[in-house]
Amino acid sequence: MRLNLHATEKKTTVQNVENPNNSTIPPLQQGSSSSAPQASGGTLASEGKNIASMPAIRQHLSADGENGAARQKNKSFSLKNFLGFKKTTKAPAQPTNPGSNVPESSRIRRPTLGDFLAQPEQDGEIQAPHPSAASPRLTRSPGVSRHSVEDMRDKPVAKADPRETSAIDIKHQLNNFNQMRQNILNKTRPFSQGATTSSVMDARAPLPAIPSTTSEITEEVDATQPEQQLPQRHLDARENPSRILKTGRDVTSIHRFRPTLPAIAENTAEAEANRRIQPLQTPPPLENTPVSPLSLTLDKGKLRLADSNPTAMNTLLEQTLGKEGQHYVAHTASAEGNHHMLLDEQGHLFDLKSHEGGYSVFHNSLPSTVKMQLSKNNDEPIKLVNDNGKLILDRGAEGQEVLHLNPPGEIHHAYLSGIWRHSVAGEMNQENQWVRIHDDKIHYLNNEVGVWQTSDKTPYSQLSVQGDGKLYAVRDSRALHNLSDNHVSESFVDKIKSFAVSEHGEVAVLTDTESPHHICLMPSANAVSSERIAFSLHLADTMQMLQRGEPHLETQSIALKDGRLFAADSEGKLYCGELSQIKDGELPMNPMSQNVLKQHFGHDHRIEGFFTDDNGQVNALVKDNFRQMHACPLADDNQFHAGWNLSDALIINNQLGLNNINPAPHEIVNLGHEGSLTLQDGKVHYFDQLTRGWTEAEAGCQQLKKGLDGGAYILKEGEVKRLNINQSTSSISQGRDNFFALPHVRNKPEPGTALHGLDKTDKAQAIAVVGVNNYLALSEKGDIRSFQIKPGAQQLARPARTLSQEGLNGTLKDIHLDKKQNLYAVTREGEIFRQAREHWQQGESGRGWQKLTMPPGESGIDRIETDAHFHPVAVLLDGSRYQLRGETWHPQNASEPTQLETGLRDSQRVFARLNQDMKGGLIPGTGLTIQASAQLAGKTGRENRQIKSKFAERVRAYIFNPTMATPRPLKNIAYNLQHRWQGRRGLSAVYEMQGALIKQLESQNVRNKGAQTDLQSKLDALDFGEQGATLLKNIKQFREELENSATQAAILLGKHQGVLTSNGQINEKFKPPISKAAIQSFNVNRSGRDLSKGLEQAVRAASPSPQSKLQKLLSHFVTSGLNMSHQKGDIPLGRQRDPNDENALTKSRLILDVVTLGELHEFVDKAALISGHNPDPSQIAQLHQQFEALRENQYEANPVKQFTDMGFTHNAALEANYDAVKAFINAFRKEHHGVNLTTRTVLETQGNASLEKKLKDTLLSLNAGESMSFSRAYSGGLSTAFVPTIKKIPVPIVPGAGITLDRAYNLTFGRTDGGLDVSFARDGGVTGTLSVSTGHDLLPYMTGTQTTAENASDWLSKKHKISPDFRIGATLSSNMQRTLQNSLNFKLTEDELPSFLNGMIQGTLTPVDLMKKGIEHQMKQGSKLVFNIDVSAASDLRAGINITADGSKPDTATFRASTGLSASANLVSARSERSTTVGQLGNTVSASDNRPTFFNSANIGANLTLSAGVAHDFIRGASVSQDGTTKPEKKPGTFPAFMSVNVSAALALDNRTTQSISVEMKHADPVSQNDIDELISTLGKHFKDSMSTTLLSSLKNQENPDPAEQLKSLDRHFSYNNVVGDDRYEAVRSLKQLVQRQRAAESNMMELGSAKHTTQYSNLSRLDENGIFDILHHHFNAALPPTSATRISNMMANNPLLKALIQKLQSSPFTSASVSMELKDGLRDQTEKAILDGKVGREELALLFQDRNNLRIRSINVSQSVSKSEGFNMPTLLLGASNSAGLSMGRNIGTINFKYGQDQDTPRRFTLEGEIAKANPDVASALSELKKEGFEMKS
């Protein structure tokens, strides 16, 4: 296979450079590198692109081109000749394609690595492989698959069925493959070269030695057997390509471009002997492609793939080209089978090619033109005919030509894969060379073994075939290298930005300068500087100059063709100029209006670059508004036409020889369920769980460390970043152009935002990480600094602390932390030092370092590391290992190999076990799940007996605990009354502190009568010298923190009292209520004093700043007459707190802040005594100690501060959440508790110790989107009915009523970024029910009797007859339920989880201790109101016995047995819900007002019931009236009371739909330098104009930058740009959002966080189908905006892949779906600005969600939940009670996240998360098989 050269107008004359030795310089040959079949793929996205920049005029002659330059000087240079205006017009002959006529028989098969490894050795002789069939492979060789070392060692080729596969031991394979390779190489004597070659090689630097393992197999090999040496040489070449060197070549003149190889020939005789080796007969040597051509056909329009194809390729093609619904009308293929073209019904033309580098397939950009012709087909057959490179579409049997198409060429495939082919001069003829760039280095494909090899370490870029058919690349950023002719240009001064070569070999170069319009024109790549022509590009249109304010063109990329220069500017616009018009160093450039591209791709398309195709046509690389790249050829009409889609493609590349790593066990960082990482040569690699191989992820890293929180962190360019494991797929284009999107998520680590605090100028050398909020760094100067970050914010909680150096000796090399956070430092001299956690956290004031004794042994320390449990391990130079336990070192065995494959996680096993316990399924075609349930004699959860606890344990847990203790129901009632009166004993510290703060405020107001200088001014006047600079900075930060905290508390109180609006502005309409003081006077817990006046007095006396917003707010409270009372210092009657104050804790927090500000004033006054007197370190240390006591002990440790930081505003919510936490401590601590019992049953453990371990392992294995919940619920109620006597109605009417009190507790663990999300919740509610029932006995009609009594039988007893009946009945009921909700949510890191679980399960921690665990606490409080109307019907066959005596009145007792069927349905349901979530970072308000919905749920069931009860007849006795009339006895009605036990089973389905709106307001962080750096990087990628690049460069290089000022500069420059294109739009939006955030931070206001409208569906068909009421609503009002279902349905219609994904989600049982909608960008930006202007509050914001024209679909989520619940229902005569506990798990089945651009109605792309994002098993197996064969799918 050879490169197809396009026709040129004139053959290019290449001038040969003189050789000093008068020898012919051969072309550049292949290089070498070590490789293995498990080699990992690198990032190849940038290969083969021409990204342009600007020229350099001044040049320096290179040594290589000196003689050539001298010859060029002697020749005259003519611009006319240079531009191609020759006197002759003779057209050259069209070159033929050298590869097109090569017969298949000439393609000799060559062996692969599998062949060599599969051949057994017997008596020193290698046997040919067995001719039995082998499974299809990516190579043509029939060798065995590379499964494991054992499969390849000492075994013949397996004769089993090739389709059978064995389990793959990846770990063993990776650890031993290099050993096997080295063993083979050790016993193989490679070919040798002659003496001349040896002398050349000896002068070169030797290659690094290949590491060998400790265990080697040595075997003597007879070197005289030629049939053995050739395959061993091939094996040597594939496994150690650095040993390859062809014989018979003169290498003296090309050694600069050849791999450096050691001399391998002992003498000339040996070399001659090696040359006489006969070729291997079986298999024959392969000289061409190592990739098997594909065989495919069409069968009735469906793609059929041959079994002979590689199985992996068949799988991938079946999932893409062969997927369901894809039909084809025509197919054509080359004779060799390496090139196929397919045409489908929609006009998509697919081009599939196999070549030496792999496989590639893509399709045309504009199928509509072809589809138009197909629509005229009239069922006539369609044929594709390839006529000398032209593709003809024929119709009918006679072959009527319908359409001529230009097929893509080899260059299109090369551009996609990054693998290029060119021809070089060989010994006998032209040879094909396959070239690529990897890691900025040129690599060549060794055709004998199919391995990529590198020549040298010189960096290369911009590899491409140019207009003259030659392969070029930019060498070392400043020189142009013609690889085909081996010419290197003289280096330019500036970096080459873009270059172009015409069909005649002329070269235009654009270099990267501040003026991107200078071009350098050369007659050839190796022209000397005197032959270069420099000129500038200027705009020919004067009006365009005026509009731009710049006469020159800001060029980004260029192309040359037919004497014309094409250029794309920074805006992606196209220009063209005639080179003949160059005058005075200027070339006028005219805009090329591209109406055709605009029509096809929209007005916002961009020209990103150019390339020349196989036909010599210039192609523009056009990016459309969906970010897809298209190759568009230039036609005769001077227009670029839609060509080929280069983004929607399938690329499989050969990666053999690239990125082969085999890390040692100690080099692997194990992240548990998230996989494994390693750092090799500054590059982070991850073990890909999909391909089961190591893959590169991030380069340029100094260190990779595992934090104590379980996360991975890197040190890169002086910054610390957490590596977040990817959980979503790459972006998938919305629309139909995503044929080759194979959704799959890989566990690739991606660096997050740099952790705050560390400055790049510190040049950190090593890190030790506690978690994302706490880390230490070792600087280049040897200082160790600790950083404490405020959780959830980009601010330091306190300034960085530099650790004391006392006790340290030597130069520090690395630092580590153990599991107790003790710090270890190792020096370059091999000494180890330790400092305890409590000491290093104090910084310089902490104690010194302790030098540890050296481990035993004579060898020195090599390194310190920590094991999986963070125990320090010292590794000596001799490899021995010692673990530190206490103060002594203990020998440790060598590290065990890390388990690289994660396997089945514990959480997956538990989920599968619970899922097995669920009974039910999906009703076909409905989207509804039907679920079964059963109960037996009051015991619930009996539908499945696979997970069940013992009967005795259930009785003890849910009914009766046989002890002498007070029964639990009685204790609960008593505790509830006690807690309501006096609060919780565990919260007494909070109650006491609230009273103490009142007294402190009063005391401070007595001391401070007059005003004094504000605190900020006092601090500005302090001078502690250099020694006290850090202390002064700490004090200033604390002052700012106090003022901001007090201001936020005052705003919160003002909003609640009504004196401020919801957006924090002054409420001009506020009037103090007249009756408020009178009402508060009746509250004995209130002090009656005005808190506003007391606070205003304290702040006025000790103001925090000159323009204090706090002081202004409090003054406004006073002047507005706000009488804000507070509780007494001492609460009477033992109540401890005021339970009726809804802002008690907020008031206490405000008092705390104000009192602390006053004390800080006093502290600063004392500190001022030594200010300006250069205080000594002891004085500074004393001040620091006093300051720490004030900040840490009095403020941070204050319980009011701690609980208000969690979001609590009053005591009732705090007590409710305290109760929830305590309930679960008791639930897990007591083994007889229902929660403990259910959890142990599900997890299959015995006892609390094993429960703690299994629960820890399960929770740590939770993946993103997974959660585990524990529930505890009980209820009690009263219900009754009355049967009135109504004679005129044939059926009875039975009214009923009931009331139920319920309480539920819930504990949930869910996976979140950086840890686990923990939520404690308590819900309490009351439900009232009204019902009316009726029924009738059908048995008399069936038996022919008149009444039920006539069917009675006395066969059992003469006195107590059995009365059978067959009764049908119906009930109409309504109920209203009100529920109060309380919850506490926080985040736990993985290192905190074990102690958390231990304290909860063993009961060693109090509820307050557990509540203080974790970070980012949030308190939620809300209420829910639900109204339902239900209808039910039942039919029962009953038999009752009246067990009272006949005639007994008024009470009768009855025993009844019955069996029957029942059905119920919800007719109407309405729901309203409100909740507020408050935390230190912000608050969220959610509201759900759902209109009445109909037919929401249904239930059918069967039961067998035994019941007994009593009925009381209300009888009015007979009486005689005054007139003597006798009134008979009258029975108004009957009052029944029954209890029952039954066995029942039911099927239920839910069709509910609910909607809610949530608005989050969060505290704004000031913009940081990290934010600016990321913003500059983003803007720089998309704004290439000179003004923007100059601004961005100047900001990036500023010294001591101010982020706020830099943000203003960026805003001024970019806010006025007319943004076109989605990339620029998103970049500018990021800038605007930062500007809004900074504005909110400066004004101490809250910014808008998330604002969304969410619709929840129980019926998944409602995702894309409207309900009946929506249909009717739109029928009568067509102007209504489309519903979310309509929008999703339209997106599915336009995207078959999205349709398939959603339909797959809808097919999952036990699921619920949610659709989130958000404000469109423009409206959101306006809203954010209005919020900061004080014009819009939360109420006005909620109104925007009522109009769906303002919204866009944000995401679609489908989640699945499985559960196990056990309990007991205990009905009595009138009272009923229930008690239950359960464990449930949820997981994210799939989330589809949509991304938008400038078009806010149609998403541009989407990503997938959850289970649906995982590759299906077939694709996963295919990708894994590709990896084993050395191939990878390119993203």
From Swiss-Prot:
A motif (WxxxE 2) lies at residues 840-844. Residues 147-163 have a biased composition (Basic and acidic residues). Coiled coil: none annotated. Residues 13-25, 94-104 have a biased composition (Polar residues). Induction: Transcription is positively regulated by the alternative sigma factor HrpL. Residues 1-53, 86-108, 123-163 are annotated as: Disordered. In a yeast-two-hybrid screen, interacts with the maize protein phosphatase 2A (PP2A) via direct interaction/association with specific B' regulatory subunits. Keywords: Secreted, Virulence. It holds the Pfam family AvrE_T3Es. Disruption phenotype: Mutant is not pathogenic but can still elicit an HR in tobacco. Major virulence factor that may function as a water- and solute-permeable channel dedicated to creating osmotic/water potential perturbation and a water- and nutrient-rich apoplast in which bacteria multiply within the infected plant tissues. It comes from Pantoea stewartii subsp. stewartii (Erwinia stewartii). At low temperatures, may be protected from degradation by the chaperone WtsF. WtsE-induced cell death in corn is not inhibited by cycloheximide treatment. Residues 26-42 have a biased composition (Low complexity). A motif (WxxxE 1) lies at residues 694-698. One of its GO terms (cellular component) is extracellular region. A motif (ERMRS 2) lies at residues 1831-1834. Contains two WxxxE conserved motifs and two predicted endoplasmic reticulum membrane retention/retrieval signal (ERMRS) motifs. The WxxxE motifs are functionally redundant. The predicted C-terminal ERMRS motif is present in most AvrE family proteins. The WxxxE motifs and the C-terminal ERMRS motif are required for both disease-associated cell death in susceptible plants and HR elicitation in non-host plants. This is Type III effector WtsE. Belongs to the AvrE family. It comes from the Bacteria. It is found in: Secreted; Host cell.
